[in-house]
């Protein structure tokens, strides 16, 4: 696929505290957060004029689904725009709490686990052709995705019966199947539920739910860009060595608990390899592929960071990527904090630091304090993120949805939209079906907008 449609869905952890004590239940916090949304959208499940979807997911987790993007840097920008939109709701909700005499700070965390052991996700979406054999795609991808956490894990201090350990991935402990149609009960690596949100005869949506939510823009770029390159190789018929794992679910935990990434995991054919070996295999094939086929600046940046991350792990010189890879950035931060204050990894102050890294409030979150201090690399710019809060991507179907919503709101017209349908709720009940996610111009939508 020369052009691919990408999308990201992030669920956020939410809490309201006053002097360190929980003040409101997650349900109550969510109600305050979404009050403004419900007042204009008459629902806690809405599409926005930038083409994105904002809603309350199971368990009172705010979720932001980006509009369809056709480039990875665009997707990073729109994912960050989702953070800013939620930060705006947070500030508004805190103001309303104060007006009602309730003291407390609301925190939104872009992470994947809470203190009670619940998990919530970051779901990646990649459009693939319908003609390919989906089971083969999954077979090749599972070993890649199990080992990919060494590139893009968000890092976590995990309290175990044997003491605290630093894990590479937050999500790894909560994955129970390789491939399945469920998302919550069994939490697979790849979700096979067939909902393309596009022409089902031409397209299929690959729904990857194994990844961690990332604060780092560069980690996000690597996560999405490396996966796109592996998909391109599969689509082009590149022969990849069989890396099928004997037990992917055991392997994903073993990889997460081994910061050296050298621990051997068993393949289905009896061989034993490390996560580093598996990633090296995919990486070297991707380098050859791009050299042969040619690649744009994004592919080259992805390959550069991919190679440097593997080198940093191999040589145990994590500082090489401490500005670019979430789990490394956070580990270095925690390590320095512990040394400075003489703390063990099990210290509550370390747990607090771990959580603060993911706080999306730019005045409180540790990641954003590091960003302001110039301690992390970037992919996008604040100006582009600000624009993406209200302007959809201009080269995908999201543009049509965004324009329709914007005009309907300006004209105070009642409307219903989803990923594929645009509908005016007037007597004629006019509906336009947009089945091609690559199409950003459509006469039928123009006519519908002009009729308002």
From Swiss-Prot:
<dbReference type="GO" id="GO:0016879">
    <property type="term" value="F:ligase activity, forming carbon-nitrogen bonds"/>
</dbReference>
<comment type="pathway">
    <text>Protein modification; protein pupylation.</text>
</comment>
<keyword id="KW-0833">Ubl conjugation pathway</keyword>
<dbReference type="Pfam" id="PF03136">
    <property type="entry name" value="Pup_ligase"/>
</dbReference>
<dbReference type="InterPro" id="IPR022279">
    <property type="entry name" value="Pup_ligase"/>
</dbReference>
<feature type="binding site">
    <location>
        <position position="63"/>
    </location>
    <ligand>
        <name>Mg(2+)</name>
    </ligand>
</feature>
<dbReference type="GO" id="GO:0070490">
    <property type="term" value="P:protein pupylation"/>
</dbReference>
<dbReference type="GO" id="GO:0010498">
    <property type="term" value="P:proteasomal protein catabolic process"/>
</dbReference>
<dbReference type="GO" id="GO:0000287">
    <property type="term" value="F:magnesium ion binding"/>
</dbReference>
<feature type="binding site">
    <location>
        <position position="419"/>
    </location>
    <ligand>
        <name>ATP</name>
    </ligand>
</feature>
<feature type="binding site">
    <location>
        <position position="53"/>
    </location>
    <ligand>
        <name>ATP</name>
    </ligand>
</feature>
<dbReference type="GO" id="GO:0019941">
    <property type="term" value="P:modification-dependent protein catabolic process"/>
</dbReference>
<dbReference type="GO" id="GO:0019787">
    <property type="term" value="F:ubiquitin-like protein transferase activity"/>
</dbReference>
<keyword id="KW-0067">ATP-binding</keyword>
<keyword id="KW-0436">Ligase</keyword>
<protein>
    <recommendedName>
        <fullName>Pup--protein ligase</fullName>
        <ecNumber>6.3.1.19</ecNumber>
    </recommendedName>
</protein>
<comment type="function">
    <text>Catalyzes the covalent attachment of the prokaryotic ubiquitin-like protein modifier Pup to the proteasomal substrate proteins, thereby targeting them for proteasomal degradation. This tagging system is termed pupylation. The ligation reaction involves the side-chain carboxylate of the C-terminal glutamate of Pup and the side-chain amino group of a substrate lysine.</text>
</comment>
<feature type="active site" description="Proton acceptor">
    <location>
        <position position="57"/>
    </location>
</feature>
<feature type="binding site">
    <location>
        <position position="55"/>
    </location>
    <ligand>
        <name>Mg(2+)</name>
    </ligand>
</feature>
<keyword id="KW-0479">Metal-binding</keyword>
<feature type="binding site">
    <location>
        <position position="9"/>
    </location>
    <ligand>
        <name>Mg(2+)</name>
    </ligand>
</feature>
<comment type="similarity">
    <text>Belongs to the Pup ligase/Pup deamidase family. Pup-conjugating enzyme subfamily.</text>
</comment>
<dbReference type="GO" id="GO:0005524">
    <property type="term" value="F:ATP binding"/>
</dbReference>
<keyword id="KW-0547">Nucleotide-binding</keyword>
<keyword id="KW-0460">Magnesium</keyword>
<feature type="binding site">
    <location>
        <position position="66"/>
    </location>
    <ligand>
        <name>ATP</name>
    </ligand>
</feature>
<dbReference type="InterPro" id="IPR004347">
    <property type="entry name" value="Pup_ligase/deamidase"/>
</dbReference>
<comment type="pathway">
    <text>Protein degradation; proteasomal Pup-dependent pathway.</text>
</comment>
């Amino acid at each position: 696929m020369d052009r691919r449609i990408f999308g990201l869905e992030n669920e956020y952890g939410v809490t309201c505290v006053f002097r360190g004590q929980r003040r409101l239940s997650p349900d109550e916090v969510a109600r305050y957060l979404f009050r403004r949304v419900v007042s204009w959208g008459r629902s806690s499940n809405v599409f926005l004029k930038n083409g994105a979807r904002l809603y309350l997911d199971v368990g009172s987790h705010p979720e932001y689904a980006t509009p369809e993007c056709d480039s990875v840097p665009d997707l990073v920008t729109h994912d960050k725009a989702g953070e800013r939109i939620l930060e705006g709701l947070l500030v508004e909700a805190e103001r309303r709490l104060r007006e009602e005499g309730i003291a407390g700070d609301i925190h939104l965390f872009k992470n994947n686990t809470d203190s009670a052991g619940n998990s919530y996700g970051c779901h990646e979406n990649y459009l693939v052709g319908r003609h390919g054999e989906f089971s083969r795609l999954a077979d090749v991808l599972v070993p890649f995705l199990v080992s990919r956490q060494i590139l893009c894990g968000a890092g976590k201090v995990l309290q175990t019966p044997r003491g605290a350990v630093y894990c590479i991935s937050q999500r790894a402990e909560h994955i129970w199947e390789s491939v399945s149609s469920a998302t919550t009960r069994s939490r697979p690596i790849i979700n096979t539920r067939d909902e393309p949100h596009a022409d089902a005869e031409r397209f299929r949506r690959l729904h990857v739910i194994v990844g961690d939510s990332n604060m780092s823009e560069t980690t996000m770029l690597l996560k999405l860009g490396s996966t796109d390159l592996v998909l391109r190789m599969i689509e082009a018929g590149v022969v990849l060595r069989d890396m099928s794992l004997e037990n992917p679910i055991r392997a994903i935990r073993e990889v997460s608990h081994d910061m050296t990434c050298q621990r051997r995991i068993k393949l289905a054919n009896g061989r034993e390899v490390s996560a580093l070996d598996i990633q090296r295999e995919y990486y070297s094939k991707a380098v050859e592929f791009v050299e042969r086929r040619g690649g744009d600046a994004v592919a080259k940046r992805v390959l550069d960071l991919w190679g440097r991350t593997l080198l940093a792990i191999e040589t145990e010189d994590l500082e090489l990527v401490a500005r670019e890879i979430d789990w490394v950035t956070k580990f270095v931060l925690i390590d320095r904090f512990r040394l400075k204050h003489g703390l063990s990894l099990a210290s509550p102050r370390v747990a607090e630091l771990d959580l603060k890294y993911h706080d999306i409030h730019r005045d409180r979150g540790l990641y954003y304090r590091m960003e302001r201090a110039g301690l992390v690399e970037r992919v996008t710019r604040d100006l582009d993120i600000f624009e993406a809060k209200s302007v959809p991507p201009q080269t995908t179907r999201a543009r049509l949805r965004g324009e329709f919503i914007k005009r309907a709101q300006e004209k105070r017209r009642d409307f219903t939209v989803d990923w594929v349908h645009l509908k005016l709720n007037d007597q004629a009940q006019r509906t336009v079906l947009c089945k091609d996610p690559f199409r950003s111009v459509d006469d039928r939508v123009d006519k519908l907008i002009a009729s308002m």
